[in-house]
């Protein structure tokens, strides 16, 4: 793609992201995370496999002004605090499927209505350490 999508805050550095974007000649789209529970972008944001660039996200995890970086790229769909705490955004996308960490997540119905296939993988033991589905995956491309 033409963009580097990233976040900084508790565990990441904005300058490092800008440097990486420059090295690969990408436009940086970087947001600031402000909630320590959501320490990486994949804990509070997930791009969905739809034609409209839909993405679920937890608004309270982000500095309000930095969300403007994403508003021109994504149709942002907020998740509730309850869903965020269940790490709904830490789902995994494979083709047209979205794998959620629990079936007790309200946003699942909305995501299904967008045309995504829904899969559930119970990772409740991993949730105790602050991670879910995406934290258990290494993507190879």
Mark where each language-model region is.
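The feature marks the mature, well-folded catalytic cores of soluble enzymes
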Residues: 1-141
């Amino acid at each position: 793609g033409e963009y580097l999508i990233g976040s900084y805050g508790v565990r990441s550095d904005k300058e490092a992201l800008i440097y990486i974007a420059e090295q690969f000649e990408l436009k940086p789209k970087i947001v600031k995370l402000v909630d320590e529970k959501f320490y990486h972008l994949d804990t509070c944001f997930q791009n969905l496999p739809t034609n409209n660039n839909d993405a679920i996200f937890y608004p309270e995890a982000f500095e309000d002004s930095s969300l403007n970086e994403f508003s021109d790229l994504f149709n942002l769909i907020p998740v509730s605090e309850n869903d965020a705490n269940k790490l709904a955004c830490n789902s995994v996308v494979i083709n047209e499927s979205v794998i959620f960490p629990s079936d007790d997540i309200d946003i699942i119905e909305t995501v299904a209505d967008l045309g995504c296939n829904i899969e559930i993988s119970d990772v409740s033991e991993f949730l105790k350490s602050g991670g879910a589905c995406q934290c258990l995956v290494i993507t190879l491309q």
